Amino acid sequence: MVNVGINGFGRIGRLVLRNALQMQILTVVAVNDPFLDVEYMAYLFKYDSVHGRYQGKVETKDGKLIIDGHKIAAFAEREPANIKWADCGAEYIVESTGVFKTEELAKEHLKGGAKKVVITAPGSGVPTYVVGVNLDKYDPKEVVISNASCTTNCLAVLAKVINDKFGIVEGLMTTVHATTATQKTVDAPAKKDWRSGRSVTNNIIPASTGAAKAVTKAIPDLEGKLTGLAFRVPTLDVSVVDLVVRLEKETSYDDVKKAMRDAADGKHPGIEKGIVDYTEEDVVSTDFVGSNYSMIFDAKAGIALNSRFMKLVAWYDNEWGYARRVCDEVVYVAKKN
């Protein structure tokens, strides 16, 4: 078992813990969040408006979070350097605060006894790895790495299959993205991006995203070929990527569908089974709540204008599915070390 500490017990932090308990490969031994006492941690973990009530036993005792009898140390430190990871044996840290995203800041965890740090966001100046795309290039000498974003995890896998099979000349990506915690429930000031301050409950909000450009960190061959934007919408979970691509090779949409089916079956080089799913059913977003896949290709939603210009559609659970990939990445890093 791999001993893990979680810094930041927000949406991703809590779902990483749920996934770890389900997978039974990782052992979460400690959680740190300066804004939550242990009783509140237990409450937020037990009750979830999207993914439902945790079905096991959740309790607290002597300042520890106890889940199904498993004791988890609870810290409330503001600075990573002050978290005593070594006291509970946490070697691999999931950095899910959204704050400590540079190598310098994330390395502060090592002062408390950690060995490796995986950031659950695009990192600044940090090696980026996407499961099923470039994780095999991970260097065990690297102490801090990024698992990129939820959107990048979906888009990178989709782009890898298309680029490997048909070649991408250029592409534009739109993600129709579910609500996240940083958005406002009613109109409020947002100095950096005025539109992001508008109410999420009754608006479709155009937003910037670095997801498309971040794909090039995992697939350097696509440098300068992809960009994109986001629309934030009033749904709680599950997002969808709309990728319009110009292809190098002439092909048919049926050939694209076959390539995606093969990827879903684990037949595409580098993409293990369980990363990609494929559907031809009449699905909508809530059908993918709790999906483990990085990318679910929606064959019915896509369309081809001609043999080299196509619109491709792929779903992803931006919470649960992403948290599963974080766990997968930690497992891989631990095996390599």
From Swiss-Prot:
Entry annotated with the keyword Cell cycle? no
| Keywords for this protein | Cytoplasm, Glycolysis, NAD, Oxidoreductase
Any idea which positions bind NAD(+)? R11, I12, D33, R78, N318
Pathway where it operates:
Carbohydrate degradation; glycolysis; pyruvate from D-glyceraldehyde 3-phosphate: step 1/5
Q: Which GO terms describe its molecular function?
A: glyceraldehyde-3-phosphate dehydrogenase (NAD+) (phosphorylating) activity; NAD binding; NADP binding
Query: Which compartments does it reside in?
Result: Cytoplasm
> What main location does UniProt list?
cytoplasm
Question: What is catalyzed by this enzyme?
Answer: D-glyceraldehyde 3-phosphate + phosphate + NAD(+) = (2R)-3-phospho-glyceroyl phosphate + NADH + H(+)
Give any Gene Ontology cellular component: cytosol
- Note the site residues: Activates thiol group during catalysis: H177
Could you give a single Gene Ontology term from the biological process aspect?
glucose metabolic process
Enzyme Commission code(s) on record: 1.2.1.12
Q: Where does D-glyceraldehyde 3-phosphate bind?
A: S149, C150, T151, T180, T209, G210, R232
Q: Which SMART domains match?
A: Gp_dh_N (SM00846)
Catalytic positions? C150
Q: Disulfide connectivity?
A: none
Share what the entry says about its subunit structure, partners included: Homotetramer.
Protein name per Swiss-Prot or TrEMBL: Glyceraldehyde-3-phosphate dehydrogenase 1
Organism from which the protein derives: Agaricus bisporus (White button mushroom)
